[in-house]
């Protein structure tokens, strides 16, 4: 496991979060290195706020620590990784400000550094937010995998900010340089396309999705399969783990006037979407709900829930990994009381059946089709 980011301009020890003993994935990528090298060679020349967007595990926050940056992310995991890696390198975590991706940005930033993901909706939302604060003196520099930077990516920068150019590729990463045109008050107003709203078929409910929520414009097929096979007998207290827009928990609230649902996700936008969907569709059910941005079930009391519903992700940022699903299952086993149930939906090829058997010593197939399987495990 490579943990030392050692360049001509910095030497940092960095870990992914949660830290694992045998983690084959490192906590930075070539785009981080490219940004660090470029910022070192072209240092900041004016005072003003420094904004970092989508810093995966804190490499950029650690490098720019001396500028007291505002680190903007939708990911609770990224926030915790940033704090842990700052401490790992003897840097004061209180010198930076962590901010979720829905909060307002500081005015007139001197520098904005963006990690570009392959999901353009989040980038568009962030560029729209930057449009409200960036000035012609703001330096905007972004980086990502070269394969994820397309003409449509550059078009977004030009639409919301101003003239844009790209760098040569380096280690399969590429930079984007953008020069904002005009001041926020001089720019014409543009419509905000977020959150997106679509009808949940078979109901009179409207589903709201913020920019970084999976399957923004329709019900994803895994969730659809789970909705078709939700448990007939309700539990008193249920957790919708990895809730996304909250459609599973929302459906439980709609059909059972007694159930209490806790919506948990590591994405701020996911939990905000779940809350918005309950507020819009079932406002009377709000007293029976809780909303938590969290790393799986960290801090959730043992025996505090009767059933957990879960549609596990199999990637962290852009890396494919099964450790998140394993942590979700392990946390569920810890939190559930005897007789408590974990219900999951997943792709058939992911072998969740054997993982559940290792933890719970049982796993029952509730339903399956050519692509998905729904499994139930009971705490003995």
UniProtKB/Swiss-Prot annotation:
Reaction equations catalysed: guanosine(1835) in 23S rRNA + S-adenosyl-L-methionine = N(2)-methylguanosine(1835) in 23S rRNA + S-adenosyl-L-homocysteine + H(+)
Localization (cell): Cytoplasm
One Gene Ontology term of the molecular function aspect: 23S rRNA (guanine(1835)-N(2))-methyltransferase activity
GO CC terms, sorted: cytoplasm
UniProt entry tagged with the keyword Zinc: no
Main location, first listed in the record: cytoplasm
Assigned keywords, A-Z: Cytoplasm, Methyltransferase, rRNA processing, S-adenosyl-L-methionine, Transferase
Family: Belongs to the methyltransferase superfamily. RlmG family.
Record function comment: Specifically methylates the guanine in position 1835 (m2G1835) of 23S rRNA.
Name of the protein: Ribosomal RNA large subunit methyltransferase G
Organism: Aeromonas hydrophila subsp. hydrophila (strain ATCC 7966 / DSM 30187 / BCRC 13018 / CCUG 14551 / JCM 1027 / KCTC 2358 / NCIMB 9240 / NCTC 8049)
Lineage: Bacteria, Pseudomonadati, Pseudomonadota, Gammaproteobacteria, Aeromonadales
Encoding gene, per UniProt annotation: rlmG
